[in-house]
């Protein structure tokens, strides 16, 4: 009860108020030091309650392949445990960096018409809430509209704008060589 009467820093209070809109108990933890291990972070999170799921992300390819991405996701058993983790961990120093702890937001991926236009979450990242809403047209409908326009343009060419002449990049030489290239010809010109 004493923890409930405690005043929260303004930033943590606004983060916790966002939690009322969340359905799950999933948190995004960012600004992780590259030296922090999955094991140590999991041990730190278990102090706040039962961890149902923990996703520590690594680079899959490129120059940083196998190295941590600098953020992770954690699901707690209850909302109270998640809120306590936000209160205690947000802004705390972990190795050389201050942790950023937020409620995770579902990122939505739209599939094409052949897959029944299902809208499914592909991951939970904080950036997804800032993306503008996409139009309701499916990708296949847009492709079909563009193909129809191209077909119409091919059938009814515009006389006002003639087609550009085709340039041949591999133009055959005017003269065919009878002998192979020789450097001695360059030396004799000097």
Curated annotation (Swiss-Prot):
Residues 25-106 form the RRM domain. SMART domains: RRM (SM00360). The keyword RNA-binding applies. GO terms for cellular component: cytosol; intercellular bridge; nucleoplasm. GO terms for molecular function: RNA binding. Keywords: RNA-binding. Transmembrane segments: none annotated. Residues 166-190 are annotated as: Disordered. InterPro entries: Nucleotide-bd_a/b_plait_sf, RBD_domain_sf, RBM18_RRM, RRM_dom. CDD domains: RRM_RBM18. SUPFAM superfamilies: RNA-binding domain, RBD (SSF54928). This is Probable RNA-binding protein 18. It comes from Bos taurus. The gene is RBM18.
């Amino acid at each position: 009860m004493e923890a409930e009467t405690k005043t929260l820093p303004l930033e943590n209070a606004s983060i916790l108020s966002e939690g009322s809109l969340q359905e799950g108990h999933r948190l995004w933890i960012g600004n992780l030091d590259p030296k922090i291990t999955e094991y140590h972070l999991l041990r730190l999170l278990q102090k706040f309650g039962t961890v149902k799921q923990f996703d520590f992300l690594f680079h899959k390819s490129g120059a940083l392949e196998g190295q941590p991405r600098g953020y992770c996701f954690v699901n707690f058993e209850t909302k109270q445990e998640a809120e306590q983790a936000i209160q205690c961990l947000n802004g705390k120093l972990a190795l050389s960096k201050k942790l950023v702890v937020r409620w995770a937001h579902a990122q939505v991926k739209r599939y094409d018409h052949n897959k029944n236009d299902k809208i499914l979450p592909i991951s939970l990242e904080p950036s997804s809430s800032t993306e503008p809403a996409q139009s309701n047209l499916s990708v296949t409908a847009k492709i079909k509209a563009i193909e129809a326009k191209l077909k119409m343009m091919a059938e009814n060419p515009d006389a006002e704008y003639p087609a550009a002449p085709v340039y041949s990049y591999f133009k055959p030489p005017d003269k065919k060589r009878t002998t192979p290239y020789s450097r001695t010809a360059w030396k004799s010109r000097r």
